[in-house]
Amino acid sequence: QTNIDLLKMKIPNKKYITNKESGSKIIQYIHDDLSYLVKKDRVTYKKEYLDFSKILKERLEFFDEIAISNTLNFIQDIEDDIYIKFNITELQRVIDNNLSNAIKYSFAKSSIFIKLAYINDDEIEFTTTTHSKKIENVKKIFDDFYRENIARGGFGLGLKIVKDICDKNLVIINLDSNEKNTKFAYRFKINEDTIT
């Protein structure tokens, strides 16, 4: 990463620098997913009060280079100072897998809409909305190794990780997909405990 930063200082705004940085971030994201899979059954992921708004903005900044290299952009609607009781590693896996999939499956030169907002005094909702092909098999999309479009790459593990984390933490998932848009919505209780 340091070498890429030096190149950016010497040759600013070059497309191949963006692509190289994008590639390094994809590798880091995949590593984080695999690391979680290896550790999840033998590590206790303790909860703490987290600034969801701040973390989401930081992850959007991380994925911005990847979006740009895929001719996409993020449009954010994030309420400030939304705090929840959650584990930082698990929250990041939920966010990262959704942002990665949004980039992977969006139509070229389109926008990805990211929203985080209170829906009542006890619950918040995190949503990603993309202009993309309709998901044909909604029931299987969260299964191990399932991929709607093999040509898009990936391992088919990301959404399984997301579902396991959401089930464990009582996060409600809603998926709406049609011919024009796909929307993933995650409803978090602000002080929810895990399933014992």
Indicate residue ranges for each PLM-predicted region.
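Conserved DHp (HisKA) dimerization/phosphotransfer helix of two-component histidine kinases, i.e.
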Residues: 2-6, 10-66
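Conserved catalytic submotifs in the C-terminal HATPase_c
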Residues: 48, 68, 73-83, 119
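Short helix-loop "hinge" at the ATP-lid/N-box region of the Bergerat-fold HATPase_c
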Residues: 102-103
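Short beta-strand/loop element within the Bergerat-fold HATPase_c
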Residues: 109-122
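Short conserved segment of the HATPase_c
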Residues: 134-145
